[in-house]
Amino acid sequence: MSKSKRYQLEKKIIVFLSSSLFAISGFCAGDVYAAAVFADGTGTNSTVAGVNNNASGENTNAVGYNNHAISDNSNAIGANNQALAEDSNAIGSKNNTYANESNAIGSGNITNGIGSNAIGKDNVANGLDSNAFGTANKANSDNSNAFGTGNLADGISTSAFGYLNNVSGNESVAFGFTNTISAAEAVAMGRNNQVIATGGSAIGNNNQAMAMYSTAIGNDNYAIGENSSAIGLGNNITANDATALGNKNTASGISAGAVGISNTASGHNAQAFGYLNEATAQDSQAFGAQNKATERYASAFGHENEAKAYAGSALGVKNVVTGDFGSAVGYDNTASNYLANAIGTSNVASGAYANAYGVYNEATASYASAFGYGNKVGGEHAIASGYNNNIAGNFASAFGTENTVSNIRSAAVGSNNTVSGEISNAFGYNNTASGNYTNAIGYNNQAQAFAASAIGYQNRGLRPARFRPAPWVVPTK
């Protein structure tokens, strides 16, 4: 088919469609009193069909009421449309195409960008190859897209889908309702999310990604640190490389992590996992429920533990560590001095390098050790092991049950023994060594004099022991 014959056929089809259109719609413009015209337009190979139409461009068509197809290869169809650029189409009512190869279809749409499309009602496509579909959308930059109602795609290669989304950063995307993006390479999905930094992501409801490559996912999360992630409900991040996952966690230290419910990680590299934990110092850790790690390298694991000293460790329930490098493990233990250790239940290690292991033991002097139940050691370098032993002397020891040693370098082994003398010993049951350098060994013995010994059963050492030679030994002169 020759070009002229094909054009005549297309013209007849347009006239036929135009006649049908007017018969059904009453010319789409209310009461129209002028007679419809079906004729050639003023442009070469152009056609006008309807009332008050103008087809002045080459190969143009103006069909309906008060339409204008001015530029070559353009079409204006409907009512009050203007196709003012080459290869453009304005179809519907009050549409305007100002850029080549653009399309405005619907009502009140405008295209200003080459190759752009505005389809629906009151949409504007200003950018090169931009698209605005729906109602009152604007695609202002090249390769931008706005779909839905009241969306604004203001950055290059941006997309806004949904309702009242605003995207001004290049290569960014917003999906949902009232999301705002003002940075490049960002994503906002959901409702009322905000991204203001490059590479940020806010997904869910009322989230804010305020720093470069930050992520806020869920509801009411806030991420202001670079490369940070706030995921869940009401999490808050204010430092770089930090993470908050769960419900109402706060991570304010660089590279800190808060995971669970209402945890706080405010120290550099601090970690708080669980419920209501606090890791407030650099490299501190709090795991479990209501634990606190408040000094550098401190660790609190379990429930209601407090690690308040440098490199201190509190593990279990209600343990407290206030001495540097100290440890409290179990239930209700306290380690309050340098390198002190309290392990078990309700033990206290308050001396430097002290150790209290078991139940209700107290090691209150430097290098003191208490093992067992209810032992109390107040002497330096002293040790008590067993049940309810009590030591007050330095370098002393008590092993057994309810022994008491109150002087230096003394020892009590057995049950209910008492040693109050210096460098003295009581071994057995209910023995007393009250003099210095004395020994009471056996049952109910008492060594009271200096260097005295009472050995056996209910003996009294009232004088120092002396050497007595055998009677057959002849004394030398």
Where in this protein do the model-derived segments appear?
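Periodic small-residue-enriched repeat registers in elongated scaffold domains
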Residues: 30-477
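Bacterial Sec-dependent N-terminal signal peptides
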Residues: 1-33
